[in-house]
């Protein structure tokens, strides 16, 4: 807002349109008529009056129209809008009024004359209202909201600019120049309608105090209606009664709203509320303070300073003539009594302020109320809180309680440090105050603050007796968590510096390839001729690592892309005799993609479990890990390595098809040009494969380096990709090899339970100078390929590839790699049982001198698989075992089937299968256990057939039934013959019917924590409940049926027993099974008789009534369908 402090009492500024501005007095000078950068003392302002009176009519929109809600009263303000503001901002700091000249010239009128003049002005404005309406312009549509001043009592227009400069003892108007410079300099000459001139009642009453010479004026605003309070920014819903004074100051506050709030004790607090974040702004240069003026019954109108609480604010004691002491807060330096301030800022007004949390109201509460509560505390020393909660203070070393005050509504109060528990709801603080906790703890606020549930339960109804122990444990956890976060931040900062160090070390390794193995960041680079290591600079993809193999006589140039979440060490080995003269340069890159990092230092193995499967980051590690956990090679060991690293067998799986390459490039967000270049580079070279690599269907590509100096081409130089970290044991520690190998092999079963985990175990052995022939090596390798092809029936995530067993001169490297594509998943599996003896035989045949236990890392190909198949421990395309089937059927029987996520819950209960697999398996075999036996029987037969043992199968197929009819041997031959028939040709009619698919098993009940559950543990043990709940039912008593007969059957014993029984009862005549004694079924529901009264009858004679059960069934059978073995026509 632009306001000029007028120094003459008869001058007033009506905010009229341009047609009425011609009636302005001589001393009214507008700022826009003063050139910028001009020093304009007050006495020289008169010469600018002509320019100010010659304003054009297009300047009408400089004045804003302020309307009421019903548009009946129109208020105007002398505020310039932002649209017509001059581009040159006015330097008000140059205005230095002549204090001496103005001191004696000020001639002020009495308050009575001022009121009479204002009343006349209101009546005159009411008569001229139609003419003004035609000349008013619409307000500018800016981002600021308009402040509506409702007044529906009388239809009168009030003037917004009131100048009531009252001076006691004819004191001059003084302004602090320094404060004006701090607040006004550099601010553009613009304003908006959110400088609040609080509405004044149209029937202005002159409330003169008892002592008239004091000229104390109080202008009383109308009490607003409940519906008209929504323009206030200070909790209009709390029935805020707004009152203001047309007093000696004009209140301005940048980005603030001046409003008044009434408390219960008729104390009016004028708050300065920030419109942006509902907090006070500590800007003294833009917030003006006033003296408090008595209103009505002596209650005080206190204007709050720009601080949040009343603590620390400076107050004055101004003695008024009526003898009352009125406290006033001063926000500007120096004496600011009875002053009017010029502010050229553009405050921003947001009428609807986003509401904060309930707990933040305590920061915005009126200072006067806090002062009243504080005074009450000093007297009573007892505070009652409701909706209370616990908060940690003093860097998690103590606690306090916070809650709503019962005496004052909607005011939150927090205590000092709690030191003593008087009762469960009565506490004493360090300052001596007593806090009484009413009701239960505020659980919602406690959970939002991050407190654990067990602590909330302990303090649910108050403080327990051992509250100190619980609080100390909780605060200790908080402090430990902060320390861990600080350490993590430091490691992250250190990791950023490692990236720069790695780049510089890479360049140094190119130039100086001597003695760099003992650095923290090294590169394994055995250069020979034109063999180079090219690392992509990751301009398009920062996380993907590309290694291009370049040779002088290149035929194979596959582009390798390491899997995600895999920590790589790259070794490039050159050929020939130059290896002995070169130094080992190591570069180790680590990547920690998640919190789950488990390091086993004793076994020299590390397991990285990744939560984010598809994160592509640069492989970084902090310096402390590099330096502390890395064992550098000694000079003797490096020389020994350089001699013995002549033979290394590399396993590389390049991407064959163009589509797969494009998908892999798209995963790492490479550009289209890069994808095309990579595809064109890889596809032609893959077509030029060597004959050895073409013969390998499962390994797809193999490089064998340094077989001999003249026999092998340079394209067999290897690029060996290993995981994690290479450690060389001392030459004398040969006995540690066996133990470490056993530890490695023990971890192999765990691979089946961890999805996307790729384990590489790398053993380096001593090689002798004599070389094996190329033919023998090729033959062994072809045998290894044949073994891999035979075992591709086992489909799993892990691809365990064991390279061929080498003689003493070769370096055997058992490698476990992850397949690059889904097609190769079926080709890269060897059973674990075969993996162990192959490695053991290798260790026995070759003299092992060096050991390279490498870590297990987590790799992921999430995009190529179903998103629901990423559960940990998921085993894909593997046959179901008995345990999984049992879990499947128990889960299917217990879980409710009408809910949408039924199969997902079943898969979660099984734990190792996807929902699709569970559904497919249950639909294939809903009864479960029957077909599983056939599957387990087929497995060894298939494995025997795959291993070439066809002789036994041929013998079984040529079995002839030669035994006589009715003999035990005949029965066994028939059973063997039937078992060898192809079972795949027979379809199970009942498993394929639609009714069978729609069969729904009765679900059992979920686990319940209640002890009074009617059906306890139904899902765990789905058996018939006890007869305590259900009525007694008499079941048929068959004396010959025992629990042992209901179990599994041994065929050999059963056949012998049945045959002997058959032979023994043959002479008696009749059906053998009909001679078994049976007790008649009773129909009454009497209490079952004890067992001691019904002893077991060993006589299985004619008295048995079991034949009556099967009479109808036996008679209905045809003669052709009678059981051949149990009929009377059996021959001896």
UniProtKB/Swiss-Prot annotation:
Annotated Basic residues bias: 930-941
DNA-binding as UniProt keyword: yes
UniProt keyword annotations, A-Z: Cell cycle, Cell division, Centromere, Chromosome, DNA-binding, Isopeptide bond, Mitosis, Nucleus, Phosphoprotein, Ubl conjugation
GO cellular component, one term: chromosome, centromeric region
Pfam families reported for this sequence: SANTA
Basic and acidic residues bias locations: 497-513, 779-790
SANTA domain ranges (all copies): 383-469
Residues found modified as Phosphoserine: 9, 110, 131, 135, 172, 192, 299, 365, 772-773, 824, 860, 1008, 1086, 1104, 1116
Assembly description: Interacts with SP1. Interacts with MIS18A. Identified in a complex containing MIS18A, OIP5/MIS18B, MIS18BP1, RBBP7 and RBBP4. Interacts with KAT7/HBO1. Interacts (via N-terminus) with FLNA (via N-terminus).
Cited function: Required for recruitment of CENPA to centromeres and normal chromosome segregation during mitosis.
Official protein name in the record: Mis18-binding protein 1
Lineage, broadest ranks: Eukaryota, Metazoa, Chordata, Craniata, Vertebrata
Protein's gene: MIS18BP1
